Structures are given as C-alpha cells and as structure tokens.
Design a protein with these regions (language model features):
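P-loop/Walker-type NTP enzyme "switch/lid" segment
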Residues: 1-35, 140-142
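Mobile beta-alpha loop/short-helix "lid" or hinge segments that flank ligand
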Residues: 1-2, 8, 48, 130-134
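Conserved, well-folded catalytic cores of nucleic-acid-processing
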Residues: 9, 29-36, 58, 82-86, ...
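Conserved active-site and cofactor/substrate-binding residues in soluble primary-metabolism enzymes
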Residues: 21, 107, 154-157
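NTP-binding/hydrolysis catalytic cores, primarily Walker-type P-loop NTPases
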Residues: 141-185
C-alpha cells in the first residue's frame, strides 16, 4: 500500500504546544489513513515536548536518530527516559546518523546504550547507520529520496537494511491511545 510520512519539520512547530485534548483528537484524525498505508512514520523534533511524547507513546515502534555528539546524546536520552517513564515504552530502535563508518556507528550506539541501560529499564536495538556522505546531502538539497534516484547506491542499501531491522523489532505495548492499531513509527 505504501509509506506515509508526517514530518516534524519547521512547518509543524506549532504542534509542539497543543493541549492534551487536541493532541488526542489529532491522533484519532489519522484513523482514516489506516487502509492507505502499510507503515506510517511520524517525525518528531528532538527533545521531549508533551506533543512529541504523545505521538511517540501512541506509536508501535520508536526509532531514535542519534549523532555522535553530546547534544544528540542528551536529546535522545531525554526522549527515551520521558517515553519510558510517562508512556511505558520499553523498546527503542536506534539509527546512528552522520557516522564515518559502521565501526564508528556501533561505537556511538554502544556508548549511548551503556549510559541509557545504566539508568533506565529499556531495551535499545541498533538497526543501522547512515554515513556522512555527499549523496545523502545532495538528496536532501534536491528534496528527492536517494532510494528513488539511486536504488543500488550504498546509502540506499543501508536504508533497506535498516528498514528490515526496524520492521522486525518488537512493537511496544501502549497503555493509552494509539495510531489506528497499525504500525506507527
């Protein structure tokens, strides 16, 4: 059926300050899309606003995008902790972005996993990495997905591998409202 994406980009920053009733109504408003997509991505900004947490906690799977920088670690840890404490989320998938190579990405993940596991009863799963590359940068500038323009390049193959890992990861058991009882990532 396809893939749908709700971007957390600049145009949606006003969603950060929604009241609880409006957030719940917004989550329910996606119900008609249930038959129109196989996977539904919700991209929330870094940090742990009430709106971001509502969307994360309503999702079957949570994907944390981590960069090997202190601010990224702090934002990711804050989101993991808040989603776990407030929403009972226990399983998180992690992709390392802008890594030099796979070895560096796994090292970055291990450092984050060690810290998070020390203080939180959560399970973090490494699903892959994306390199710091010209191809990805060009794709962003052109606003054309790399997996469409060059399906066989290294980055496209990494996306495919990450997708398989993510889809095979366990779903979280939500205690509250969820997105149309279908995979919301």
């Amino acid at each position: 059926l396809g893939l749908q994406l709700i971007s957390g980009g600049n145009g949606l920053l006003d969603l950060l300050n929604l009241n609880q009733s409006t957030r719940l109504n917004l989550i329910r408003s996606f119900d008609p899309l249930a038959d129109q997509c196989d996977v539904f991505f919700i991209d929330v900004p870094a940090g742990a606003s009430d709106s971001s947490l509502s969307f994360v906690n309503a999702s079957d799977k949570v994907l944390i995008v981590l960069v090997g920088e202190p601010t990224s670690f702090m934002d990711a840890y804050t989101m993991v902790k808040a989603a776990h404490v407030e929403g009972g989320v226990k399983d998180f998938s992690v992709v390392v972005n802008m890594a030099e190579n796979e070895i560096q990405s796994k090292d970055t993940f291990q450092k984050f996993n060690k810290t998070a596991s020390k203080f939180l009863d959560v399970k973090l799963r490494y699903v892959g990495y994306l390199p710091h590359s010209r191809a990805l940068r060009s794709s962003i500038v052109k606003r054309k997905p790399l997996v469409v323009s060059d399906r066989k390049c290294r980055e496209s193959l990494l996306f495919k591998s990450m997708s398989k890992e993510l889809l095979s990861s366990p779903n979280n058991i939500a205690s509250g409202i969820t997105f149309f009882n279908k995979s919301a990532i």
